[in-house]
């Protein structure tokens, strides 16, 4: 297959996927209320839900609502936090958990409608943190380490230093990356905010399928680091990349 044919087939496949997803304005997406946790996995996800302090770029927004409608995001124009200083409908954090090797991994993901401002324009950005604990079924379970997405790499801390904890919650900051202007995560001693948590399993079928099929990577070269981190196939790879032990 020559290059022209390959590009045409790639564009056709992209259009087919996008046709299955309904996109709506980023500030009209309704978040899921945080359900009362029932399982050990859900209780641990709520217990260890991080605090997030936003010092640069967009605040977290819901990426999908119950009927499967997905955020269309924002062009990377204007100020870094322009038109994305927080949704009037409420914010959201997503999580998915599983055993990885001999540790329990809780992956948290925040959706930002604007990825890069100025000349690096890009819609959409997912910020991700993995909290590693010993066992979600234990009443006195313990954080063993935390991994943060950090550009192309992961920034890890195992064990986590106490100054970056507020009880059972790690304190994170979304700040301006030094190499080029885009939000990144780092540990902080400052108190942040929490968002309503919805786990991957608690999402409606429509919402889960929409997040799995939505196009969050507008670049020609596709990479899993820009895809929805919790979806099948990407979740497992991200856990492997984030392993800190």
UniProtKB/Swiss-Prot annotation:
Motif Hepta-peptide GHRHDWE motif positions after renumbering to this chain: 121-127
Residues annotated as signal peptide: 1-19
Protein name: NLP effector protein Pc118551
Record note on domains: Key residues/motif important for the effector activities are degenerated in most NLPs, including the nlp24 peptide consisting of the conserved region I (11-aa immunogenic part) and conserved region II (the heptapeptide GHRHDWE motif) that is important for phytotoxic activity.
Location relative to the cell: Secreted
Organism: Phytophthora capsici
GO annotations of cellular component type: extracellular region
UniProt function note: Secreted effector that contributes strongly to virulence during infection by P.capsici.
């Amino acid at each position: 297959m020559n290059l022209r044919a390959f590009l045409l087939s790639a564009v056709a496949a992209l259009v087919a996927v996008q046709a299955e997803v309904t996109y709506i304005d980023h500030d009209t997406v309704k978040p899921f209320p945080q359900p009362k946790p029932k399982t050990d996995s859900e209780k641990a996800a709520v217990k260890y839900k991080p605090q997030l302090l936003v010092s640069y770029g967009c605040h977290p927004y819901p990426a999908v609502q119950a009927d499967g409608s997905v955020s269309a995001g924002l062009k990377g124009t204007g100020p870094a936090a322009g038109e994305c200083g927080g949704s009037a409908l409420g914010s959201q954090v997503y999580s998915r958990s599983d055993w990885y090797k001999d540790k329990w991994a809780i992956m948290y993901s925040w959706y930002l409608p604007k990825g890069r401002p100025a000349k690096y324009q890009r819609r959409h950005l997912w910020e991700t943190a993995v909290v590693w604990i010993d066992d979600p079924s234990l009443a006195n379970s313990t954080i063993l380490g935390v991994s943060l997405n950090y550009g192309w790499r992961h920034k890890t801390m195992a064990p986590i230093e106490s100054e970056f904890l507020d009880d059972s919650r790690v304190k994170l900051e979304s700040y301006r990356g030094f190499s080029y202007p885009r939000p990144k995560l780092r540990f902080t001693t400052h108190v942040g905010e929490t968002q309503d948590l919805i786990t991957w399993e608690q999402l409606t079928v429509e919402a889960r399928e929409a997040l799995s099929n939505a196009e969050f990577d507008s670049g020609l070269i596709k990479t899993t680091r820009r895809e929805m981190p919790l979806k099948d196939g990407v979740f497992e790879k991200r856990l492997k990349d984030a392993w800190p032990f």
